Amino acid sequence: MGLKVSSSLLCLTILLAVSSIVSAVNITRVLEKYPEFSTMTELLAKTELTPIINKRQTITVLALNNDAIGSISGRPEEEVKNILMNHVVLDYFDELKLKALKEKSTLLTTLYQSTGLGQQQNGFLNCTKSNGKIYFGSGVKGAPQTAEYITTVFRNPYNLSVVQISMPIVAPGLGSPVKVPPPPPMSSPPAPSPKKGAATPAPAPADEGDYADAPPGLAPETAPASAPSESDSPAPAPDKSGKKKMAAADEAEPPSSASNTGLSFGAVLVLGFVASFVGF
C-alpha cells in the first residue's frame, strides 16, 4: 500500500515539474525566431529585463519591430528600460481576447507599475477600440492613443502572448514622446483601359452653313462642274410620247384615190337626181 502511494506521489511530482517547464515563459526563445524583433531582444537583455519577464507566469509583451523601436533605441539606458517595462502587460491578451473586450477603453497594468515608481497612472496603459481598430496608449489622462495593434505574433494561453504594435508608447514623465509616423502616400487609381470592340464614330459631314461661317481660306474649295460639250453629249433617246404622236399623224393622213373616186360617183348621182326632178 505504501509503495503505491509513494509511486503516485512521484508521478505527480514529475508531472508538475514537466508542466512547469512547458509553461515557463522564455521571451528570448520566442523572439529569436523572428528576425524583425532582434533589436527589441537585444534591448531587453541589455536593460536586464529578460530574467524579470521570464519569472512571470502570465504576461503579454507589446513587441516593436526593428524599424519602430529605432526611435527609442538611442536614448539613455535607464529611459529605455522604463519605456520597455511599459510594454509588458501583467495579463494575457491575444487577438481574440482584445476583440472580445466589451468596454470601449480598458485599463491595463504594466511591469513599470509593479516597481512602485508609477505616477499619475503612467504605469498603466489604455486599450481603446475605435472604428474597428485597437489602439494602445498611456493611462495618463489626455495621453495620445496612437500605437495600433497589428497582429498576434505568438500565443501560449494563458502564459505568454507577444502582440505587435505600430509604435513605441512613451508615457508622460518617462521621456519625450515619439512622433506619429505619417500615413503612407495614396496611390492614384489606374486609368481605365479602353473597351475592346468600341468603334470610333466617323466624323459627321459638315453642313453648308459651317463652310459659310468659316473664315476665308479655310472653307474647302469645290471645282465647278464643266458643262458637257455637244460632241460629248449622247443623242437623246426617243420619247414614247413622240411615238404616239407619229402614230396619230399617220392615221390623220388624207384619203387615198379610191376614196376620192367614191365621192365623185356619189356627187354625179346626186346631180342626176336633181336634174330629173327639175324636168318633171
UniProtKB/Swiss-Prot annotation:
<keyword id="KW-0336">GPI-anchor</keyword>
<comment type="similarity">
    <text>Belongs to the fasciclin-like AGP family.</text>
</comment>
<feature type="lipid moiety-binding region" description="GPI-anchor amidated serine">
    <location>
        <position position="256"/>
    </location>
</feature>
<feature type="compositionally biased region" description="Pro residues">
    <location>
        <begin position="180"/>
        <end position="193"/>
    </location>
</feature>
<dbReference type="GO" id="GO:0098552">
    <property type="term" value="C:side of membrane"/>
</dbReference>
<keyword id="KW-0325">Glycoprotein</keyword>
<comment type="function">
    <text>May be a cell surface adhesion protein.</text>
</comment>
<feature type="propeptide" description="Removed in mature form">
    <location>
        <begin position="257"/>
        <end position="280"/>
    </location>
</feature>
<keyword id="KW-0732">Signal</keyword>
<keyword id="KW-1003">Cell membrane</keyword>
<dbReference type="InterPro" id="IPR000782">
    <property type="entry name" value="FAS1_domain"/>
</dbReference>
<dbReference type="Pfam" id="PF02469">
    <property type="entry name" value="Fasciclin"/>
</dbReference>
<feature type="domain" description="FAS1">
    <location>
        <begin position="25"/>
        <end position="169"/>
    </location>
</feature>
<keyword id="KW-0472">Membrane</keyword>
<dbReference type="InterPro" id="IPR033254">
    <property type="entry name" value="Plant_FLA"/>
</dbReference>
<feature type="compositionally biased region" description="Low complexity">
    <location>
        <begin position="219"/>
        <end position="234"/>
    </location>
</feature>
<keyword id="KW-0449">Lipoprotein</keyword>
<dbReference type="InterPro" id="IPR036378">
    <property type="entry name" value="FAS1_dom_sf"/>
</dbReference>
<keyword id="KW-0654">Proteoglycan</keyword>
<dbReference type="GO" id="GO:0005886">
    <property type="term" value="C:plasma membrane"/>
</dbReference>
<protein>
    <recommendedName>
        <fullName>Fasciclin-like arabinogalactan protein 3</fullName>
    </recommendedName>
</protein>
<feature type="glycosylation site" description="N-linked (GlcNAc...) asparagine">
    <location>
        <position position="26"/>
    </location>
</feature>
<feature type="region of interest" description="Disordered">
    <location>
        <begin position="180"/>
        <end position="262"/>
    </location>
</feature>
<feature type="glycosylation site" description="N-linked (GlcNAc...) asparagine">
    <location>
        <position position="159"/>
    </location>
</feature>
<feature type="glycosylation site" description="N-linked (GlcNAc...) asparagine">
    <location>
        <position position="126"/>
    </location>
</feature>
<feature type="signal peptide">
    <location>
        <begin position="1"/>
        <end position="24"/>
    </location>
</feature>
